[in-house]
Amino acid sequence: GGPGAVFWMWLMAIVGAASAFIESTLAQIWKVRGKEGEFRGGPAYYIEKALGHRWLGILFAVLLILCYAFGFNGLQAYNACSALEYYVPDYNENGLAMIAGLLLVLMTATVIFGGQKRISVITSIVVPVMALAYIAIALWTTISNIAWLPAAFAVLFESAFDFESIFGGFAGSVIMLGIKRGLYSNEAGMGSAPNAAATASVSHPVKQGLVQSLSVYIDTILICTCSAIMVLIFYVQDPAVAVGLNGMPLVQMAVNNSVGVAGIHFITFAIFAFAYSSLIGNYFYAESNFRFIFPESKRGLFAFRIACLVAILYGAVNSFDLAWNLADIFMGFMAIVNLIAILLLGKWALLALDDYSEQKSKGLDPVFLASSIPGLPKTDCWHEEHLKDFGSGPMKEYLEESVDMDFAGLK
């Protein structure tokens, strides 16, 4: 999208934090328990349970599966493999992309056939470590080239407000590209992140809504800006070379410009780690929605997993533009369905926020009960018999369990 798209990504993040709060709070309110005790939820679930339209929930689930299992996962596979271009410029022609794609498929298969808990362990270790290291590299690159920073920001803002470019063809303008890339980076409003938010065990839905809002700032304002600043510094230093690069090779050369060859190796590993963890997370989103449509189909789930692995291999060896175009199309349809749902249901998230704020003002650790909001459509969780699920050990539950014990237990 060019340098100016970064500015519109920032604005998208600020607006998106609000929609991320609403959709993730709704996902928590209408989450359900799986057979193994895990929580599942997301737009498909709150559309069915709160709006009463299962057909619309199924439509959303199908769109999410197409977007994440086949659009975004193809893009992530491409990103991971394109990092090889620095080492082998013709990697796609000589079969190396196919080998790398098969390796990705094998690594992903070991996780998706191993269950959700293994997903959590891998992503919770890999992502924070690599994110912190990535930020450190970006800070070093920025500080070591501080004299070029004003020129980099000048290019960014000049491009962002190039009105001839903006209004010359709005659908392909810097604003639209910034919005689409911002939506891709933080998912806010699309209805994908709520699938992850619903799995959390918290004492109040609003707690997870606030966490999801924060995540929007972390990934778009912090992580993506790190990439942008490194690339823009490289661009103003050597525009002829920068213009000829795309995707991961552009980021690799931007780091090489400041850190040296070691920086390229780090970026290669970091991008592979980010892309791999994203493949796993995206698959989990898709599987949660597949289970919504076909809750009891074990054979169907096996076939679905195989199809997802084929999509990863396909993305690894196909073009950059195709991956982005598929992702953009499905992403737009997902957002339309989900935004309509959160406009209709947003009042319940705001009432939950009022309940949370009231408890916080009294110095309490907020605990949510569905009965605290009059008229709230039926929920599977958040009733008194589920207090033990909340994880905060409310006094009422403790006393009820203690009355049958001896005095020491009650004390």
Predicted regions and their residues:
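Membrane-interface loop-to-helix entry segments
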Residues: Y78-L84, G95-N145, L149-F157, F290, ...
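Extracellular/periplasmic helix-exit of transmembrane alpha-helices
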Residues: F21-K31, I137-V155, F163, F167-G169, ...
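Extracellular loop-to-transmembrane helix junctions
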Residues: G1-G37, D219-C226, I264, G332-L339
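Transmembrane helix-loop junctions in multi-pass membrane proteins
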Residues: P3, G71-C81, T108-S120, W140-A152, ...
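Helix-loop-helix module between adjacent transmembrane segments
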Residues: M12-G37, P43-A44, E48-Y78, S82-V111, ...
